[in-house]
């Protein structure tokens, strides 16, 4: 009986899943998203990886899928090796896999996407990511100075997933000089990559000969001024029909057509970043906010019943915000994750230029996975909701029940 279908794209996040299926001969069909017609209807998020199992089981998020696949391994000793033999080992394996999935991968991804021109380049953000990468590498080095593997005495799912995350960086933005500074991490990485379990998917990983870096776009050469036309030529040009006139340039973003606002969004973003939120920043915001220029929306995730671990839900928010990068100059807001593992949700408040949410949000492919409700700050309950979403210091009220905020992201 088939054990399911795994929908993937080409990403190091999927190396461990592919390895488990191949090495342990699991009866799981691997489908490339580009070759699938049914994927979008099965998984509304349209994000890979995704797994369809027996009896309608649906899983998203790489870690959840890998833990499920590892549990399908028939050999009990192999299962214990991959997942841990007791609660301490299991917790350590989840700890290292989670650290790699959330922190290592995300901090590598932002510089990579910036250098490739896929998201706007921000030097401050990129530098902060490299500092975090070095700090994470130091944590791995400290463990691997005395141990062969990250979580237990044997290669585990923690190693498989973490090595996949580091592979992304080592093949792109982490060049020879960086690798030379981290011999323990590199010894571990090479050991895991050579393991029979992951040898096949890791065979395509080529360490970067030179680190990928940011290349500023080339400035276009200014056109030479044309020679002054004679009076006769000018008259001839004036006589041309209006159809020959050059068409007006369209705005790069629909919201650009609204022009500049009296409310300076960048001033608010700096205020929010630099001052205490509730006592200082929020009073400043309400004093300067112009509801004729901006509107505020309650944004809620439609598929909370599909969410599992809270850090995965937060990663989902981070990905959504990354895909909104084309609109961030017209937006500000927060989405928070409330609740606990296997019982959590995503909600928040986002301010956008204009009175319609769609032009700001529809730049993200998954924008329809969220529902949008316009808020009226003249109503005390709506204003307080915005305050709470942006301050993160009070529980979220869901169906009359208080739910603690466990994580969140700021869109700015």
From Swiss-Prot:
Its main location: cytoplasm. Residues 86-217 form the GST C-terminal domain. Residues 251-412 form the EF-1-gamma C-terminal domain. Keywords: Acetylation, Cytoplasm, Elongation factor, Protein biosynthesis. GO terms for biological process: translational elongation. It comes from the Eukaryota. The eukaryotic elongation factor 1 complex (eEF1) is probably a heterohexamer. Two trimeric complexes, each composed of eEF1A (TEF1 or TEF2), eEF1Balpha (EFB1) and eEF1Bgamma (CAM1 or TEF4), are probably dimerized via the eF1Bgamma subunits. The eEF1B subcomplex with the GEF activity is formed of eEF1Balpha and eEF1Bgamma. TEF4 interacts with EFB1. This is Elongation factor 1-gamma 2. It comes from Saccharomyces cerevisiae (strain ATCC 204508 / S288c) (Baker's yeast).
């Amino acid at each position: 009986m088939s054990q399911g279908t795994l929908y993937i794209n080409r990403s190091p996040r999927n190396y461990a899943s592919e390895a488990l299926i191949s090495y342990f001969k699991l009866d799981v069909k691997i489908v490339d998203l580009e070759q699938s017609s049914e994927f979008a209807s099965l998984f509304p998020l349209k994000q890979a990886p995704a797994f369809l199992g027996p009896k309608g089981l649906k899983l998203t998020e790489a870690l959840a899928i890998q833990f499920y696949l590892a549990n399908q391994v028939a050999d009990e000793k192999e299962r214990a090796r991959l997942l841990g033999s007791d609660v301490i080992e299991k917790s350590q394996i989840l700890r290292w896999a989670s650290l790699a999935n959330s922190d290592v991968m995300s901090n590598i991804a932002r510089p990579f996407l910036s250098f490739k021109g896929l998201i706007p380049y921000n030097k401050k953000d990129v530098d902060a990511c490299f500092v975090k990468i070095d700090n994470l590498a130091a944590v791995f080095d400290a463990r691997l100075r005395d141990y062969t593997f990250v979580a237990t005495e044997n290669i585990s799912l923690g190693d498989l997933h973490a090595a996949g995350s580091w592979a992304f960086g080592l093949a792109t933005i982490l060049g020879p000089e960086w690798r030379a500074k981290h011999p323990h991490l590199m010894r571990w990485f090479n050991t895991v990559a050579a393991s029979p379990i992951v040898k096949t998917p890791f065979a395509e990983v080529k360490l970067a000969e030179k680190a990928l870096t940011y290349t500023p776009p080339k400035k276009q050469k200014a056109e030479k001024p044309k020679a002054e036309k004679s009076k006769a030529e000018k008259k001839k040009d004036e006589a041309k029909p209006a159809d020959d006139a050059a068409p007006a340039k369209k705005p790069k973003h629909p919201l650009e057509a609204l022009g500049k606002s009296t409310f300076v969004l960048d001033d608010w973003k700096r205020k929010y970043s630099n001052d205490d939120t509730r006592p200082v920043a929020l009073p400043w915001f309400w004093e300067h906010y112009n509801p004729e220029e901006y509107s505020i929306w309650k944004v809620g995730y439609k598929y909370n019943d599909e969410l599992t671990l809270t850090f995965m839900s937060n990663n989902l928010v981070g990905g959504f915000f990354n895909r909104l990068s084309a609109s961030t100059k017209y937006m500000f807001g927060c989405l928070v994750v409330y609740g606990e593992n296997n019982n959590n949700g995503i909600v928040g408040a986002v301010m956008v230029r204009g009175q319609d949410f769609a032009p700001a949000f529809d730049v993200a492919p998954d924008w329809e996975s969220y529902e949008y409700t316009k808020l009226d700050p003249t109503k005390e309950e709506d204003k307080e909701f915005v305050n709470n979403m942006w301050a993160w210091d009070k529980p979220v009220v869901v169906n009359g029940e208080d739910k603690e905020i466990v994580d969140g992201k700021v869109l700015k």
